[in-house]
Amino acid sequence: MSKTRIVKTTCSICGPCCEVDAYVEDGKLAGVEGARNTPAQSGGLCAKGAAALQYVYNKERILYPMRRAGEKGEGKFERISWDEAYEMIAENLLRIRESYGARSTVFYAGYPKWFRPALLRMANAYGSPNFCTESSTCFQAAALAWRSIYGNGICGPDMPNVKTLMLWSSNLYHSNTPMSGMYKSLKKRGIKVIDVDPRHTVTAHDADLHLQLIPGTDGALALSMAQVIIEEDLYDKKFVEQYVYGFKEYKDYVQDFTPEKAEKITGVPKDMIRLAARTYAGEGPAGIMFSASPVVHHMNGVQNYRAVFSLIAITGNYDVKGGNRQRPAPSCPVNEFGKVRRYDQEEAIGQKEFPAWFDLSCDEAQCIRLADYILEEEAYQIKAVFAMGLNHRMWPQPQRLNEALGKLDFYVNVELFMSESSKMADLVLPACTSYEREEVHALRGGRFFFSNQAIRPLGESKNDIEIIMGVMKKMGLKDEVLLQGYDSYMEYILKPAGITLEELKSHPEGMQGKNLIPPAEKTYETQPFHTPSGKVELKSLVLEKYKASHGYEGLPVYHDYRTETSIDREEYPLILNTGSRKPQFFHARLY
């Protein structure tokens, strides 16, 4: 009679990486449940997470290294050994570096994000400035908008202490299972919720106020809310006078965005705009929760988000209890994430075209120009791509990018499934799922969790970092951290927290780090903002300096796609809105 054992592990289909109790029988995954020891989950999983068996045992999984045996895009591959695969990669990437220079090779990371620091280390060891990720069309645009104002990493809302929560393009029930649990508990507590979303979602249904705007008009709505807040004297004068740069110009600009005018632009009734502004500014502390991509997936996307983020500053809700806060809970230092810097001694993709991207420390190449650097005569040409989870379907002009992938001298994709993008590759390598590998997780509140390997890797699939280590060893690339082995790498990540890998493994429910950094608020009182002015910049000096050369504007100026594009709106009245999460679907390594 087979015995069922429960393995503490994680689901890494999407960013939150929910903790999972995996039920294993005879070495096979038999079922999954959300971990019950975590307050945010309480045993819950989304539809994708609950379908783990369909995901892990999908018949379309790539299980062996596969070398192209036909024309690019034809989809004909032959099975080879890992030694042959490593030899093929080393031979081609070393040849291309010798012939064209290291910058002619791109190192690309899709999802999940756990292996990104290791891939960046590989790019650095190779000598290429062209480490890039799917965030070129996703999160980094939102992060850039934030940094242009505050100069630091994005600060989410201090959820346990908010009195008003404004959800801007954030459908928690479909995109963040742990956070949706906290959201439900806050609703029971009686907080006010304003939801900004073109769609009537489950989250919007629960809100006190739903601002159902026309897609792409977020900037006009935010500027109109600012107009009301300033006009009705609801802004935080003390904070603005002491810590904000460019308020006068900002104030003058927003005066034109009355709720009456904004109603015509956004479709949101003027009275609802006024009510939302008064609620957010007057019933605080208030926090804004935003998502990575829907707002920025439009013309003027970065400026639209800058208009949204500016509301936090003018109401004094920055880095205060219940507002958008840098460190609302204890935290613990770790190595790797955000610590590995990109090799920048040569020009990267997009550096001439998007200088603010690099000035604002995105610390990766701007991959939106990848197809151009392959197909056209740019400053230099990209000849090779080493990718982990590249899917052309998420990029603008996807067919052009797929065509470009077919023109490369050499292209590797590490994947779970044989996507169209993988069919263009010279070599496809099999990655394993989170159920087939070990991993350490640094979580909110300074908590750490060891994700156990529930089952052995299917076929000859490997974890992504072990693949990176294998390639680097074969190529003779040097990195003192990675080449010590995977266990040593996990140990290295944990070292600043004051815990060992062995300790963490002995705490199946997770454990607190030892070198805790306490919560903080109003850090700006002792430390200046990391902006050129040392203040919150409603008028960005970084963007302003590129006004003449690139047309960037320091204020969060609103440009309407309906009046500034040549598309016939009568013939094409519909507006594409992207970036939402479908609760029951995933695609390759995207969710």
Give names to the regions the model predicted.
Residues G110-Y111, Q242-Y245, Y280, N324-N335, ...:
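A glycine-rich phosphate-binding loop feature that marks nucleotide/adenosyl-phosphate handling sites
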Residues S2, I6-T10, V162-L167, N171-D206, ...:
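A cross-kingdom feature strongest in bacterial/archaeal respiratory oxidoreductases
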